[in-house]
């Protein structure tokens, strides 16, 4: 869920510059925050600083535990082509056309209006489904490297809409500015507390169309939005600029719903991967 956030190009000229501020809960000796925050060294192959990869890996773990519904040769293929899968997950945030010239417009999708935050831009539902299908075409053509790269891309967009801010078009420039990125940094610090430990993915959850799965995930995520972004958490986040107490308060407030979202994301992702294999079959 971690988001590399929103340089909006010319649109940023319409937004007042952000004041540089060291948040009370940051322990890096005074990290400064601007429109594009300085992220920790996110690594395409290290899930500790890559929540998208963490969710996909936990989903594969779920699949590996379910020897009744999941053919284990599918898990073997995911592991065989893990590097390509991880490259796709990572590229979505760092390469064009996937990150939309640093606007990340295609990483958002509001299920109520079917749009991202930029008018007429591609959104996560259509983009995630596009790469799901391209992955399938490559798979059928036995181009496994390209297939699993595209699958990684698709899984990234699915992962985004499981994050309530992405399902409500709440960007890093939404008020309070910077909340989106600081929240996603926080998620990295607690995610290991919410690992699914069983083999129960959301199998056959939303039919056979990837669009329906991405839409369904966004619907559920947006329902949980108020548990993360609300008047209290916004106020406490602003106060956290000078107060450790308020930094602790907003983090504590968002933790229960964040845990729920992380667990749902793992189960949905397991089912989505299973759908892909069901759709395009084994070699």
From Swiss-Prot:
Residues 39-283 form the Zn-dependent PLC domain. Zn(2+) 3 binds at residues 39, 52, 160. Zn(2+) 1 binds at residues 93, 107, 156, 160. It catalyses: a 1,2-diacyl-sn-glycero-3-phosphocholine + H2O = phosphocholine + a 1,2-diacyl-sn-glycerol + H(+). Keywords: Cytolysis, Hemolysis, Hydrolase, Metal-binding, Signal, Zinc, Zymogen. SMART domains: Zn_dep_PLPC. The keyword Iron-sulfur does not apply. One of its GO terms (molecular function) is zinc ion binding. Zn(2+) 2 binds at residues 166, 180, 184. Residues 25-38 form a propeptide. The keyword Hydrolase applies. GO terms for biological process: killing of cells of another organism. Monomer. Required, with sphingomyelinase, to effect target cell lysis (hemolysis). This is Phospholipase C. It comes from Bacillus cereus. The lineage of its organism: Bacteria, Bacillati, Bacillota, Bacilli, Bacillales. The gene is cerA.
């Amino acid at each position: 869920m971690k988001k590399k956030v929103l340089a909006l190009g010319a649109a940023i000229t319409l937004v007042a510059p952000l004041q540089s501020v060291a948040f009370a809960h940051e322990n890096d000796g005074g990290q400064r925050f601007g429109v594009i925050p300085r992220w920790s060294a996110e690594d395409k192959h290290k899930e500790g600083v890559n929540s998208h990869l963490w969710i996909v890996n936990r989903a594969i773990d779920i699949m590996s535990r379910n020897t009744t519904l999941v053919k284990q040769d599918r898990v073997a293929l995911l592991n065989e082509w893990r590097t390509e899968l991880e490259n796709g997950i990572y590229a979505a945030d760092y390469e064009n056309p996937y990150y939309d010239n640093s606007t990340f417009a295609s990483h958002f999708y509001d299920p109520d209006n079917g749009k991202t935050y930029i008018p007429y831009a591609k959104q996560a539902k259509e983009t995630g489904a596009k790469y799901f299908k391209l992955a399938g075409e490559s798979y059928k053509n036995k181009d496994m490297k390209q297939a699993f790269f595209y699958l990684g891309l698709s899984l990234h967009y699915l992962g985004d809409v499981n994050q309530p801010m992405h399902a409500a078009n709440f960007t890093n420039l939404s008020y309070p500015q910077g909340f989106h990125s600081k929240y996603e940094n926080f998620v990295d610090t607690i995610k290991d507390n919410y690992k699914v430990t069983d083999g129960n993915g959301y199998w056959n959850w939303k039919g056979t169309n990837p669009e329906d799965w991405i839409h369904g995930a966004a619907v559920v995520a947006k329902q949980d939005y108020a548990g993360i972004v609300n008047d209290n958490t916004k106020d406490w986040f602003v106060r956290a600029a000078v107060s450790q107490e308020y930094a602790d308060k907003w983090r504590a407030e968002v933790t229960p719903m964040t845990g729920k979202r992380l667990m749902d994301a793992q189960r949905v992702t397991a089912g989505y991967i299973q759908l892909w294999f069901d759709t395009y079959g084994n070699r």
